């Protein structure tokens, strides 16, 4: 499937990004990349289809396993108001579509993706087995952008 050692982040849903950065940053001795706020994050879910949602997120600069904090809109996969805390682990993969299909063949469920399965899933998917652990498969093609961001640069293309 993939190398589980390629986990590069733990995704945590939070109700308030700034507050969580303060609390966790000082307590865990973390520094943060520049927080990102987008008004139109692409997400497809089986229940809602394609949508574009507001999202705030940030990563710790320290690695190789980073902390990702996410503040999403109500009733979204990123909503930390009702159910904050550890949400998923993120893993770099060479081919999001292929890896996702392999997991689905093994009984995992597709929770969300950047675009629909018919469009090839896009750059990320959230998948889970019946046991409930959520894994985010992320295209390794964006790793250079993330490395630049963690080093103090921009995440933009």
Model-assigned labels for residue ranges:
Residues 2, 13-62, 98-121, 149-156:
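Core segments of cupin and vicinal oxygen chelate
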Residues 127-157:
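Hydrophobic secondary-structure block in the mid-to-C-terminal portion of proteins
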Residues 65-68, 133-135:
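Conserved active-site beta-strand-loop modules that form the wall/rim of enzyme catalytic pockets
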Residues 6, 54-56, 85-87, 123, ...:
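Residues that flank catalytic or metal-binding motifs in active/ligand-binding sites
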Residues 38-46, 74-78, 86:
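A cross-kingdom feature marking solvent-exposed beta-strand/loop segments within repeated
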Residues 60-63, 126-130:
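Active-site beta-strand termini and strand-to-loop segments that position acidic
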Residues 7-15, 59-65, 74, 80-96:
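Vicinal oxygen chelate
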């Amino acid at each position: 499937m993939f190398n589980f050692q390629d986990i590069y982040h733990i995704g945590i849903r939070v109700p308030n990004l700034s507050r969580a950065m303060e609390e966790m940053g000082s307590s865990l001795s973390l520094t943060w990349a520049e927080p990102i706020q987008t008004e139109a994050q692409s997400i497809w879910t089986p229940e809602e289809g394609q949508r574009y949602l507001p999202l705030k997120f940030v990563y710790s600069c320290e690695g190789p396993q980073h902390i990702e904090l996410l503040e999403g809109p109500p009733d979204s996969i990123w909503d930390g108001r009702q159910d904050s805390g550890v949400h998923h682990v993120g893993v770099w993969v060479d081919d999001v579509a292929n890896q996702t299909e392999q997991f689905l063949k093994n009984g995992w469920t597709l929770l969300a993706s950047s675009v629909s399965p018919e469009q090839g899933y896009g750059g990320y998917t959230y998948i889970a087995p019946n046991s409930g652990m959520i894994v985010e498969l992320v295209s390794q093609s964006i790793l250079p952008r993330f490395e630049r961001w963690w080093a103090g640069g921009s995440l933009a293309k």
